[in-house]
Amino acid sequence: MDALNEIKRWRQELHQIPELGLQEFKTSKYLKDELTKMGYEPISILDTGVLVYLDNHQDKTLAFRSDMDALKISEQTNCSFTSCHNGYMHACGHDGHMAALLGLAKKLKEQPLKWKHNILLIFQPAEESPGGAKLIVEAGILKQYLSLIHI
């Protein structure tokens, strides 16, 4: 399967399992399963968050972050891949963000580059509320990182 079709598949599958912040258990399992298939050893954080760390033996780390949670909104679309969780949906693109970060993870595995940084992929729970970014910072996960790009 080519990269674009795989990202599309991930997005559609993730779109069907929207979960509120810090309740992203199915989403977390889905992400860990996909990352494991790629050859990674995903790390669980904050119960539902997921990390992948690529150690390039550098002093600094470059992090890429995606949000995971959905909103309490009933989906009213005619898509073939609508939410399976009545009353919840990915209404602001977090399904696409996760799919894009999975795409980056796959590309990094298929075509390893000589990075001048270690790489950290963060699938962050609770972006909408109750403040998953704050919880990640408070847990000390970002202390050593050079910069952060939010997908």
Report each predicted region and the residues it spans.
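Acidic/His- and Gly-rich active-site-bordering loop/insert found
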Residues: 1-90, 99, 106-116
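Divalent metal-coordination and catalytic microenvironments
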Residues: 14, 64, 94, 121, ...
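Glycine-/small-residue-rich active-site loops that bind phosphorylated ligands and cofactors
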Residues: 20, 128-129
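Beta-strand segments within the central parallel beta-sheet cores of soluble alpha/beta enzyme folds
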Residues: 116-124
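Basic phosphate/pyrophosphate-binding loop/patch that engages nucleotide-derived ligands
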Residues: 140-145
